[in-house]
Amino acid sequence: QEGETLAVVGESGCGKSTLGQTLLNLHGATDGSVQFRGDELTGLSDREMRPYRRRMQMIFQDPLASLNPRQTVGDIVTAPMEVHDIGEDAEDRLERAEALLERVGLEAAHVDRYPTQFSGGQQQRVGVARALAVEPELIVADEPVSALDVSVQAQILELLEELQAEFGLSLLFITHDLSVVHQVADRVAVMYLGEIVETGPVREMFNDPEHPYTKSLLSAVPRIDPSARQDRIILEGTVPSPIDPPEGCRFHTRCPAVIPNDAWTGSQQAFRHAFTFRNRVEAGELDPDAVRTRLEAELGETDDDTVADRLIENALPGDLSDLPEAATEPIRTAAQQVAAGDEDDATGTVQEAFPSPCVAEAPRTVKPAPNRTAACHRVDPEHDADAEF
């Protein structure tokens, strides 16, 4: 929305930077729509995008890599003005550049210096000045402080806040640091594997997150107030490939609140453990040959049953005895199938034994509260999921 800061947060590789660059048409959108003040930007050529380039600018994550080392700072800041016919002549543009440098905390005399002559924080200030040179309405800031020292980060964040108020900017702030989000943003959008899973006002999201992924991210934020601290939610497993994401809910392979099937008689934690075993079998993470080699080194000889027992020990969080009796047999069967080299049969066994609506169906985006959205079966009234998590 006009004049607000929307933060986009998520783990590295989830698509935050690609999203920001796609909004500016630096990457072509493969699906969906990108609109700016009601105008459709998807599919526009570079020539057609030119009027929008002046209104939409970007601050990059690596300040030095985004600045031409062969150009002076004056040339870097005045180049966008020249492209968009801002300023009466070269002298006027240089004066504007000097004023911008002073506004971002540098000196007018710095126009004659080169980017390599500045510190990281100063280089980022040059990047901010360049983005402001064309008087944009929207700035996409792609992790603008992640490459800087903590003390310098605070200075750049404060500068962006001041400039936003002064120039009436809208800011899309991309970051993986939730402590930064709390400081600069009005609203936040949480991204996982290329999809927005939750949005809402920052204060409400921090106080009462809806999506399990958001809860896990917030549990990792250090808190000075002991009463505000909470138990860390550790996500098991690795992040799937965004090229081949899981079916259903993309978070189900790591979700601590994955929904059991109706026939499940154990606890949520027990199902999470059984489901983790299922995921590891499906992903081919069980290595019977390595286990067999180790057992032979330890015992001198081994058999498939012993290998299967060790596979269960390695791949199942907790103890097999903690699961309902009906769950132990398919786990033993799957482990024996893996030990015998029948990985496809093992995958079918665990898929049949431990189904979940989180796998069968992608969650729809619902509004659990005013100004809030979440894409999770647990907050969808159409799903009768026990909110134990």
What residue ranges belong to the model's regions?
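Conserved ABC ATPase signature
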Residues: 113-118, 122
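Charged, flexible cofactor/metal-binding loops and thiol motifs
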Residues: 202-375, 382-385
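Conserved signature/switch motifs of ABC ATPase nucleotide-binding domains
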Residues: 134, 141, 158
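ABC ATPase NBD coupling module
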Residues: 41-57, 83, 90, 205-209, ...
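P-loop NTP-binding/switch modules centered on Walker-like glycine-rich loops
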Residues: 144, 148, 152-230
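Conserved ABC ATPase "signature" region
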Residues: 40, 85, 91-109, 137, ...
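Conserved ABC transporter NBD signature motif
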Residues: 32-40
